[in-house]
Amino acid sequence: MSSELETQAQIRSGRYQVLLLLCASAAIAYIQRAALSVPAQEIAHDLHFIDFARDMGSIQSLWYFAYAMMQIPGGWIADRLGARKALVIFCVVWSLATLLAAFATGYRTLAVLWGLMGAAQAGAFPCAAKALGRIFPETHRARATGMLAAGMTIGGAIAPILAALFLEALVPTSQLLSTERWRLLLALYAIPGLLWAALFWYVVSDRKLPASEGNQAHRPAIDWMRLVTSLPLGLLCAQQFFRAAGMVFFTTWFPTFLQKTRGVSQLDSGVLTTIAGIGGVVGSLTGGFCSDWILRKTGSQRLSRQGIAVVGMGACSLLIVLSYFCNDIYQSIALITLGAFCATFGGVSGYTVAIGFGGKNVATVFSTMNMFGNIGAALFPITAGWLVAKTGNWNLILFLFAGVMAIDAVCWAMLNPQGTLFGDENESDSNASS
């Protein structure tokens, strides 16, 4: 009993240290996955793409398809190995895949290597969700997921300007080594993930983040029939499909969209994309705290989880449409930034509800939801690329973004966020009380 109490005390005392490291891994992952966006036209030229919009769109989409298809296997691995061990393995593999992508010789090799990196990253966020469900109680969970989402958004926000600055700084080295600067960028981006994996393994002990409560060998089998026939989970997956499809705009086509529709430079497109991303960071942080505050004040999952999601996604859709009618680029960016704020403000509900639904199988349920999200994220770049290739109108991407966010709001309006999918308690219920 004393050993169990000591473990519970270590979980409580170390939870924010674990959360900080998880946020750092999220930022690293999002910086790496957005590495192709800013130098997209350079890569297409150097690797002799036949059709820029179609070929680059298909590579971006392949990343998300690979990521989506590995979600459930990644979640299953996290539930079996525990978040600590699984996350370190995933991080090392995806960082090495990023390094290999620097040696791509053409469209096919880049597509395969980028898809491999996506597959390796697939287990990261099921692991993070499992960890948060393990160490945070219900009344603190939205702020924790909001901070994790902020880590993702920070990575996505700084990725464009970071890539643009690095690409400029790497010009002399590129000339000295007689190699393309985007290759050096990918090689450079592989380093933080490897360093993070070593730090996480050293700092976060099994006592701070236990694999799971109880004996893994006696864990009951997952009721897959209930999983695939649950209406609430179906709606949760649907909202993730549309939300992720919309938000991937910022990490794929947005810099190029600004270059094509507003005539800005590569560096300026990175800066403006980062500004929009900052709105997303602030939205994630404030949304998580606001959601938990509403839950403590009202005790209502409907208001605290569902309510802010409906308002956030609906407002985002409206603001994105309004941005199209602004002739001034800075007014347009301001509206898009506010739209990103609203989307991430409400977006924290998805992760929070998934952790609640998951009970003692958080990673599996979360990864199921995230799989559908990444199918949506995979379809958006290729659909946007196809629209531009067919019409030559880059503004259609903006309306595509607004449309999917509006549908996302409808999904949330129909979703009941209460209860757990398997009727069990959450892993944190007995050992992560505040």
Residue ranges and their predicted role:
Residues 48, 82, 103-109, 120, ...:
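Helix-breaking motifs and short loop linkers at transmembrane-helix boundaries and internal kinks
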